[in-house]
Amino acid sequence: MTSVQEKTTAEIARQLILGRDLDVAFLIEKKDPATLYFALHSRKDLAPTSAVVRLIQGIYATEPEKSRVLVRNRIYTTAPLTTMDRGMIQVAAKRASEIHGNSELFEIPEKQVDLSETLNGLTSALEYENHPRSTLAGCDDKAWMAFAVQLTRPIQVSRESQPALFLSNRPVAAVLVSKTGELLEWALNTNAVNKTLHAELNLVQSFYRKFKTKLPAGSKLFTTLKPCKMCAAMLFDAAEDMRNFKVALEVIYGEDDPGPNARNTALENFQRQL
């Protein structure tokens, strides 16, 4: 009989990284068959993501039927947990630990799923052929917020026609406008199945995939609902100069969110309600 192979979390991480300049985040589903889900992330990558973010988003994208159970397992990561990581864990997962010579032992599952590149399949709203085009260049904040509200109409229609499928797709839209009043990007909340895909997060990640840059300094982000902890942290990280955030990005929201996930966020002193 072959003995069961056990390794510490630190040993598992080293095995997955293979000496490369990468961070890794992983969790283990212990049910039969046991599965190790992991995601790698380059420490030099400036994209608005991380090993933890890639792992959580990847699980929701690839395992929609059991994702909410999977993400309740503890996540282990070699990288220091950032505000962005903690925000996503609080909103869409359960718990995580940094690996510092961790001695906890696990049986190594034969089945291992690499989720590092899952996010590459997400599509920017502005890449759709029939997306709304704004002619509001130079208009005031109220006009841009009204445009954002208008964008939520497809979600409202979907909820009315298929309430069971779209019940958790709250009608929320986010709009990014340059300092000269040009529409740069917009996105909708699509979190019915993937709990991470809030409007602001969709916007930030799709903008980076297209332009490979942070959100332009002096731009404005309009969102129809006050950002939660996850989205606030993502926006804060995506700003061109976090040390001077008010200049880098102005965040303006419409409806207040009194829930616990929208309290004491990274944007607490850097956003205003319209």
Provide a role label for each language-model segment.
Residues 1-274:
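Zinc-dependent deaminase catalytic domain
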